Each structure stands twice: as C-alpha cells, then as structure tokens.
C-alpha cells in the first residue's frame, strides 16, 4: 500500500473521488447523497483532512444507506520529495487533480471495481459498471492546441473505471504522474499515455451521453467543470437538492 495512507478501505465496488478538505466540505455531501440515491457505495480519499472534515464524514456515513468509506494522507507540498520552498500554485492545483489516481491502485485492490470521478460530480440516474476491465472518456483535443495541452485534452479525466485484475494499469498511471512535470493536464497526459497501450476490446469508451458537463436530462453523471459548478443554474439547483447534510445533523443527533 502507498506510504502514509490511513483510514478505512472499501470492500465492495465503489464510485471514488479524492480531494482536499476545502473541496470535501463544499462538494462531498451532494456527491455522496447522489450516489446513495442510486445504490452505489462510495469511497473518498482526503488530503490533509481537518477535524471539521472528519465530523462531517461521520454524519454523512450515518445518514446514508450505502457504505461510505474514507482514507486520507497528510502532506506538506512545500517540502514534499526533493522540493523545498513554497509550491507553485499550478503545481499544487495539479497535485489535487491527480490525487485520486495516485491512490487508485490501493483502492481498487480492496474494492475490486472502482469508478473514479471528480468530487463535484452528481450521479443523476442508475447505471451499471462496464463489463470491461477499463473504462475512460476519449475526446478530440481542444482546437488550436499543440504539444502538452493537445496531448492532454485527448482524454477527459473526470471519469475512469478500473477492475482489480487490471491494477497494474493504475500503478502505471500513478508512476507516470510521479514523473511530472506537475503542470496542468498531467493527469490527462498519464491516462492518455497508459490507455494507448491497452487493447481496444478491453476498454469501454464513455462519451457525453454518459458523463455530461452541459447538464442534460437523461445523462448518468453531471460534472461541474470550471465556473459551471458555481454559476450554472441547472447544476447548482440539482446540487442543492442532493445536499441533505443540514437536515442530517438534526436526524443524527435528535
């Protein structure tokens, strides 16, 4: 297992996200409740969890019907590895974007099947996990891009599915991320490079009829890309409807 990871591992197939404490407090409740409502067990990995995070995690666990588990790691990015001094904002942002892939092998070896998602995703309707060992979201590169950015935008990193017998793929993704550089799109670069070597008949390809950032009715997962997570009326309304945490406090302590 990865050095420094602690907490409770899942023991059943899960939807999985990873985040820091700020994003947990902002997005974890709607993510968990939306998964609960379609019967999917949940695992969340938290970097540098605060006491408020652990308090909220306990209440969310008590207020849901599905199994919800949490692991965590503690890290000072200013002194991580060979780095010394204030970490660049882009490198810090990239680390958190890559976080779920850094611990993916640990999680899938315990859970058997893992769908890794962004923490700001909402699960909008029931769905089955694929029958292949791997699932990912290929896409056309963004127009007018070249080099690193063009290569990175060939894959949407907001969804990635893996089964335990393909855990070496998770290891390869984590190892590629470890090579850096910690610039934006690193997670997508790692996915693109590793998945390129997997036979197509072993891979499920997702598209925007499954994971959707335009928030259309009938799609399975809504993902709050960029500012849309704050200013898109349709997404914000759905997020608020899923977020039953405030009433959970009353239910759990009454």
Residue spans for each PLM region:
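Short, polar loop motifs at secondary-structure junctions
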Residues: 49-53, 119-127, 209-211
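GT-A fold catalytic core of metal-dependent nucleotide-sugar glycosyltransferases
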Residues: 92, 96-143
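Catalytic core and acceptor-binding pocket of nucleotide-sugar-dependent glycosyltransferases
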Residues: 166-254
């Amino acid at each position: 297992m990865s050095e420094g990871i602690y907490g409770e591992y899942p023991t059943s197939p899960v939807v999985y996200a990873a985040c820091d404490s700020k994003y947990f407090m902002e997005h974890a409740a709607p993510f968990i409740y939306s998964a609960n409502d379609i019967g999917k067990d949940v695992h969340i990995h938290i970097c540098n969890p605060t006491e408020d995070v652990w308090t909220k995690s306990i209440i969310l666990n008590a207020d849901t019907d599905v199994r919800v588990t949490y692991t965590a790691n503690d890290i000072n990015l200013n002194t991580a590895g060979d780095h010394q001094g204030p970490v660049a904002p882009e490198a810090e942002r990239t680390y958190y974007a890559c976080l779920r892939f850094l611990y993916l092998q640990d999680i899938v070896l315990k859970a058997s099947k893992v769908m890794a998602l962004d923490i700001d995703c909402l699960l909008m309707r029931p769905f089955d996990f694929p029958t292949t060992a791997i699932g990912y979201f290929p896409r056309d590169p963004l127009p007018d891009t070249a080099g690193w950015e063009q290569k990175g935008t060939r894959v949407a990193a907001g969804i990635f599915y893996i089964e335990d017998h393909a855990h070496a793929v998770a290891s390869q993704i984590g190892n590629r991320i470890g090579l850096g550089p910690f610039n934006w799109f690193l997670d997508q670069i790692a996915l693109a490079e590793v998945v390129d070597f997997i036979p197509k008949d072993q891979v499920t390809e997702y598209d925007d009829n499954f994971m959707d950032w335009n928030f259309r009715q009938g799609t399975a997962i809504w993902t709050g890309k960029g500012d849309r997570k704050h200013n898109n009326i349709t997404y914000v309304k759905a997020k608020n409807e899923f977020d039953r945490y405030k009433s959970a406090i009353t239910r759990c302590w009454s």
